[in-house]
Amino acid sequence: MDLQYQSGFANHFSTEAVPGALPVGQNSPQAPPYGLYAEQLSGTAFTAPRHENRRSWLYRLRPSAGHGPYAPYVQERLKSGPFGAAVPTPNRLRWDPLEIPEAPLDFVDGLVTLAGNGDVATQAGMAAHLYLANRSMIDRVFQNADGELLIVPQLGALRFVTELGVIDAAPGEVVVIPRGVRFRVELEGPVRGYVCENYGPMFRLPELGPIGSNGLANSRDFLTPVAAFEDVERPTEVIQKFQGGLWTGTWDHSPLDVVAWHGNLAPYKYDLARFNTMGTVSFDHPDPSIFTVLTAPSEIPGTANVDFVIFPPRWMVAEHTFRPPWFHRNVMSEFMGLVTGAYDAKAGGFSPGGASLHNMMSDHGPDVASHKAASEADLSPHKIEATMAFMFESRWVIRPTKYALETSELQADYDACWTGFPKAKLP
C-alpha cells in the first residue's frame, strides 16, 4: 500500500476514506453521513487554553462503546510509575542490546521497561521501554490510557495501523501515538527499538527563542496519516494499559473502523534526517538543549517532564575547542539510546540497540579514549556521519527497574571507561 500523509504539526486536519463521510458545518449532526457514529476523542480537558487544546472528531462504523468488560492481562516485563520495586542508584548504568527471542513475540508482549519516574495516577513522569518483536499483532490492538508513546525504531521497519490511519516507520524515523488511540503493529521481520511513554502533557515543539522562526524540527516535516479503516467482523482482542496494568477484552469486530475524522489530535511520524541541526560556528560546545526535537513540559517553565533530544550527523567546526560533549553533572536525568553508528563521547561499549542511564548529579562525560582523541585532534572542519544517538531527559530521577538491574545485558564494568585519566600538571 502506497501510504499518504498530511503535513504539519498539530494542524487541524480533515480527512475521509469515503467521499462525503465527513459532516459539513458541524461535528455531531442528528444523522451523520452513511449512518456513521460521531465520537470525540479528547487529548486535553475541554477548557484547556485554545493553543494547547487537542481533540479530534471520529466518524466510525460502530460506536466504540459497544464492548464488554476487560479482565487483567499479565505481561511481567512492562512496568509503570511509581517505580518503587528497585532502590534508586546514583551509579552510572549501561546496557548491551537485548537479543530478539526466537519464540513468537509481538509488539505488546515484547515491551520491556528499563527505567522510569513519576506516577501514572498523577499524569506526571515517564518510562523508558525497549521493544523486541518478531511477529505482527494478529487480531489484536493496543491502547494506552496512561500516556502517549514516542516510538524510536532501531532495527527493522514497522507499520502502525491506527484508528486514524496507517503509518510506516523505519530506523531513522520516530512515531508518536497519542494517549488512548488504538493501534496494531505489523512487521515484515524482527524488530527492536525504544519507547518513551510520556505520562505528562503532550509532546510539542520547543520554543526557538533567538534562533528565530525556523530551525530544529520544522512543523511541515511532521506527517499525519489520512483516514483509513477496516470493516472486520471477527473476534479482536483489545489490550488496554490502564493505571500501570494491562487489561484485555474481546470485541466482535475490529475497532479500527474510523471512516473519517477531523481535528488536531492524531498520531504522527517524523524523519530525524529532516532535523535542522544548530551548533557553534566559533568556539565551545553549546548546551545539548539545541538538539531538542520534542518537549513535554512540567509545571516549571523551561524544565521538562521529558525532552526528546537527538545527536544527529553534523559538522564540527569549533576553533580551539574540545568538540565532543563535555564532562557534566546535571540536575536533569538522562536516558540515552543509539539507533545507528557511534556516539562521539564514547569510543566503545555503547552499541546500537543499547542504552545508558546517567541520573541527577551523576558524573558523566567522554571516556578516556574519546577524550584523548578529541584533545589531540586536528581542528579542521569535520563531519560526524552515519550516527543517530538520542536522549530522553527528565526533571525527575529515572529509576531503573528490578529487571534492568539484574539482566545480563547490564555492563558490570561501565565505570571502567572513566579510569586512566592522567592528573593535570600544575606549574
Curated annotation (Swiss-Prot):
What is the enzyme's class at the highest EC level?
Answer: oxidoreductase
Q: In which pathway does it act?
A: Amino-acid degradation; L-phenylalanine degradation; acetoacetate and fumarate from L-phenylalanine: step 4/6
Reported EC number(s) for this entry are 1.13.11.5
Q: Which reaction does it catalyse?
A: homogentisate + O2 = 4-maleylacetoacetate + H(+)
Annotated positions binding Fe cation: 328, 334, 364
Which residues does UniProt mark as catalytic? 285 (proton acceptor)
List the GO cellular component terms: cytoplasm
UniProt keyword annotations, A-Z: Dioxygenase, Iron, Metal-binding, Oxidoreductase, Phenylalanine catabolism, Tyrosine catabolism
Q: Where does homogentisate bind?
A: 343, 364
Identify which cofactors the protein needs according to its UniProt entry: Fe cation
Query: GO:BP terms for this protein?
Result: L-phenylalanine catabolic process; tyrosine catabolic process
Query: Could you tell me which InterPro entries the record lists for this protein?
Result: HgmA_C, HgmA_N, Homogentis_dOase, Homogentis_dOase_bac, RmlC-like_jellyroll, RmlC_Cupin_sf
Positions in coiled-coil regions: none
Per its record, what are the GO molecular function terms? homogentisate 1,2-dioxygenase activity; iron ion binding
| Complex formation | Hexamer; dimer of trimers.
Annotated family:
Belongs to the homogentisate dioxygenase family.
* HAMAP family for this protein: Homogentis_dioxygen (MF_00334)
What role does it play? Involved in the catabolism of homogentisate (2,5-dihydroxyphenylacetate or 2,5-OH-PhAc), a central intermediate in the degradation of phenylalanine and tyrosine. Catalyzes the oxidative ring cleavage of the aromatic ring of homogentisate to yield maleylacetoacetate.
State the protein's name: Homogentisate 1,2-dioxygenase
Naturally occurring in which organism (per UniProt): Caulobacter sp. (strain K31)
Q: Tell me what gene encodes this.
A: hmgA
